[in-house]
Every structure is written in C-alpha cells, then in structure tokens.
C-alpha cells in the first residue's frame, strides 16, 4: 500500500496480491506521504470488476489524446471505462461526506500492466470525484507563481495557456510554474482559496507538492491586440466552469457541487479576461493588472 497527499487530501493505492508492488510513477512520487489519518479514498488496483445487469441512467463518451473513455452514471456509483492499449474500468461509489470511499479498478487485474495514460486518467477521475464534496476541484489551467501567489491561466485547448505562463517566465523576474495542466483548487473552511500542485501536469511535467494563495484567475483568448478586463461574478463563473472536469458536469449531484465550489472561489479571488497576442507585452499587462504594480 502507498499513501499520497494532494491538496491535503490523503488517498491510498493497494494491491490485493501481496506479491505485487503498488506502482508509483515519477509524477506521483513528490506526493507520497507517511501522514497518518483516515484517507479520503482507497483504490484497489487489481480488483475484479463485473458488469452490472442494470442499465446506467446515462452514458458519456469522450476521447483522450491516446485513447477513449465511456462514463456510465448509475444512481449509486460512477463507472469509467478507459481504452488505451487495453481496457480497464474504475468503479467509484457515492459515499457520505466524512466516509472513506472504497474504489476498485481492474487496471492491474490478472497481471495486466496498463500504460501511463490509463493509470493517470483513472486516478485523476477518482481523485476529482472523491474531493468534489470537499470544495476541491481539478481545474484545467497553467499556473504561474510570483511573490508567493499563483495566477491560473485558463482557456480552451490551444488558446496558449502554457505559452502565456512561459512568457511570464521569460520576461517577469522571480516567476516559476506550479503546474502546467491540472492543478487542484481548494476552498478551505476559512474561505481561503488555494491552488495546489498535482500529479497531473500534462506535457509541462511540473510535479510540485506545494500550494499558493491565488492572486487571480485569467481567462485567455487570442486577439490581434492585448486587452484585459476584470470580470463580474457572472463572467467569472462562466470563465471557470468550462475548465472543470466535463465528466463531473453530467449529473445533477456533482454539477451542483462544482457550482457551489466555484461560487465560493469567485467571491474571494478576482477573475480577468485577457485577449492577447503571444508576446511579452501581454505578460506584462496581465502581471501589472493582477498584482497592481
């Protein structure tokens, strides 16, 4: 068994076969923990997953960069099937807040060795599903940090999120990346909103078990000139929602939890829309606006 901590939520991975070690890919190693306490969820990695006789309430098909998935939604659980050089299903039951969720997957059943796409996506989904009731969301973005605070660059795929944070790195002194694809945002009981590094960072491969308070959300779009404006709460909500996990927006319970968490985030953190060119001036414009310098 191995224990991990992401955004201060602990989870465990285990094998039923004692002779098989629990995998710990490079992107998960910074998040290994010896911290005690009841975990948010556990995943049995080599479990048997039998097909259900009843039909799901709804299904949702989507593609990955190296495969495809089917999400089946039932009244008592989600089942995500991932196909990429093989096929595996992870089963995530609904549990009451405060209970440890017991998940199971056949990723490693019968001696199988799944590729990194299957392993990462299964664990990303399991974590997102379990953390959602705790006002914790994985938000598709690239995060730059400056002076101890993070800026989350949001936008559609191909908009230039990583390009914009790279411009900060190149032209604004004292900046570093916290994550380049899948950071985790959590609303604490105090109302503070933090962004955390995670094992899911895309091609940028930035795996840091650290957190920062958020200075601002920045929704990017491409334009022939650089313009920035601060968004009201409705605009801020609309800027963030598309960057949350689409698989958790398909059912009323999880969508309500997403909307509740986002509503608290935009009360505490300002959001901006940046229409921009991929140039140094755009980076300086967003930096000076958000940090007020």
Predicted regions located by residue number:
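A noncatalytic interaction/capping subdomain that flanks phosphate/NTP-handling catalytic cores
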Residues: 1-152, 156-157, 167-176, 184-293
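Conserved lysine of the Walker
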Residues: 161
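Hydrophobic positions on the alpha1 helix immediately C-terminal to the Walker A/P-loop
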Residues: 164
């Amino acid at each position: 068994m191995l224990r991990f901590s992401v955004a201060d939520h602990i989870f465990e991975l285990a094998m039923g076969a004692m002779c098989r070690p629990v995998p710990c890919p490079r992107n998960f190693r910074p998040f290994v923990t010896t911290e005690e306490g009841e975990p948010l969820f556990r995943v049995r990695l080599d479990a048997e997953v039998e097909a259900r006789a009843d039909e799901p309430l709804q299904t949702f098909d989507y593609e990955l960069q190296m495969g495809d998935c089917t999400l089946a939604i039932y009244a008592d659980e989600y089942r995500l099937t991932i196909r990429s050089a093989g096929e595996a299903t992870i089963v995530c039951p609904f549990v009451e807040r405060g209970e440890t969720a017991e998940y199971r997957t056949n990723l490693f059943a019968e001696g199988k060795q799944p590729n990194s796409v299957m392993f990462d996506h299964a664990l990303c989904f399991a974590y997102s599903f379990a953390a959602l009731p705790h006002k914790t969301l994985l938000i598709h973005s690239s995060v730059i940090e400056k002076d101890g605070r993070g800026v989350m660059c949001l936008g559609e795929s191909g908009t230039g999120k990583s390009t914009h944070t790279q411009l900060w790195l190149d032209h604004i002194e004292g900046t570093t990346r916290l994550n380049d694809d899948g950071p985790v945002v959590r609303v604490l009981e105090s109302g503070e909103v933090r962004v955390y590094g995670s094992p899911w960072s895309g091609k940028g491969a930035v795996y840091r078990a650290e957190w920062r308070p958020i200075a601002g959300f920045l929704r990017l779009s491409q334009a022939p000139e650089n313009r920035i404006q601060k968004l009201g709460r409705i605009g801020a909500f609309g800027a963030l929602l598309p960057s949350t996990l689409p698989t958790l927006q398909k059912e009323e319970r999880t969508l309500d939890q997403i909307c509740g968490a986002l509503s608290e985030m935009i009360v505490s953190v300002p959001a901006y829309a940046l229409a921009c060119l991929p140039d140094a001036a755009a980076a300086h414009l967003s930096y000076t606006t958000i940090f007020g310098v």
